[in-house]
UniProtKB/Swiss-Prot annotation:
One of its GO terms (molecular function) is DNA binding. The keyword Zinc-finger applies. It comes from Coxiella burnetii (strain RSA 493 / Nine Mile phase I). Belongs to the RecR family. Residues 80-175 form the Toprim domain. Keywords: DNA damage, DNA recombination, DNA repair, Metal-binding, Zinc, Zinc-finger. The gene is recR. This is Recombination protein RecR. May play a role in DNA repair. It seems to be involved in an RecBC-independent recombinational process of DNA repair. It may act with RecF and RecO. Signal peptide: none annotated. Transmembrane segments: none annotated. It comes from the Bacteria.
Amino acid sequence: MFSPLTKQLIEALQCLPGIGPKSAQRMAFHLLAKSGQAKGLALSDALQSAIRQVGECKLCQIYTEQPLCNICNNPKRDSTLLCVVESPADVVAIEQTQIYSGRYFVLHGHLSPLDGIGPQEIGIPALLDRLRNETIKELIIATNATMEGKATAHYVANHIDHTKIKCSRIAHGVPMGGELEYLDGGTLIHALHSRIPVEDN
């Protein structure tokens, strides 16, 4: 039905989260229409530039073009406070509350043994190195309120149990199964203010 290149574009667009065949088809037709071609080329240029030039901050692993991101490079941030999150979108969600002044560590995932995702795959050794090498007074674990998020939180907490670092987990006004990037600001503010110690069940 579609020309080879049109089909290739539709299939490529389906790699985006939440984009199925119908949505991808609609997007492809929009970009190929004469009125959308300039935007399509601009999108292509922006995507190629970002993929070539954007990497991960060497401290927190958030996306940046520089060795250090703006947060890690900001001397006004509290370097003794470290918040562990699953994704860069979680950093954005917390930053939008404007109440957190510390720094971050982005795991880019959570523990999921059935999927072959262990501590190495989500950078936990790098996190533990950072905790050893920096003067961190409190570690806030802000993983999602899912079984995997909880397992990840307990794994991290158990590995710093012998240190003097205070370890807390954001309180759950965050609903079970919920993800930080979809929460409203009020819920996030409450959760950050109501942190609780991580304890074994």
